[in-house]
């Protein structure tokens, strides 16, 4: 009996020992399958602080850059009109140097539905693009003009929209900058079908796709599906989440809404879109969080996904 008990103890000890010996091999095999390091260098737009090309609103550019820099985002985007206003006072270059956060892109809205304005619009877009270029920006986000959606008929303006986008994109790329269509709610290109119709018809040699994934979701589309369908053309992106609540025009800090952000980020990383992803959240007077708190919440979410920030 004693011999049998000793044998059982021996076999149990051996089994435990073999299990312990096998564990490092399993861990080593698992380690080899770890997700590759994230490469995206994610930036932030400035509208969260209320930075718009309106009298007085451009004053918020400095608080925006201060917070964007403090939280280690890699670059910023704003309106060229805002940049120009600060530059004319000799304050922009020193401010960018002070906060050590580079300009990546400028946001320009162009009239796409009125051919009589085309010539003047081209001149205006070129002038604003040169402001972006002056401060080492590399991308122009080309947005459609606003319309009254309840009475708007896309098909009536389809040809003008495509023609205008081709003209504007050619003018921007002639400067050596890249540009892409940025669909937006409340404009002449909002819905999924409008986006597909336009992107399948424009000259994509010049005009790429610069989607706002939150705007896509709010407009009724599956943002991840749209990004997947046009992935080879995606050269810039506004990374935004959508919750449909009363704050921030229905948007929210990343990770709090319905947009499939991990899938979208993995897709854009797979095609090498390293420096042209911009977090964005609309401003909200008396919102539940300060702009800085929304940035910190979003940053924490991105860090959980493996993204890194400047230190």
Write out the residue ranges for each language-model feature.
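Active-site-proximal loop/turn and secondary-structure-junction residues that shape catalytic pockets
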Residues: 48-50, 80-82, 109-112, 144-148, ...
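The substrate-binding groove and active-site-proximal loops of carbohydrate-active enzymes
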Residues: 110-118, 252-255
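Acidic (Asp/Glu)-rich catalytic clusters
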Residues: 34-38, 65-70, 85-105, 126-136, ...
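Metal-dependent catalytic neighborhoods of phosphoester/phosphodiester hydrolases
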Residues: 85-92, 117-119, 154, 288
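Short catalytic-loop micro-motif centered on adjacent basic/acidic residues
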Residues: 75-81, 179-183, 210-212
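Histidine-acidic metal/acid-base catalytic patches
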Residues: 2-25, 30-43, 48, 53-69, ...
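Active-site acidic/histidine proton-transfer and metal-coordination neighborhood
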Residues: 14-23, 34, 98-102, 115-209, ...
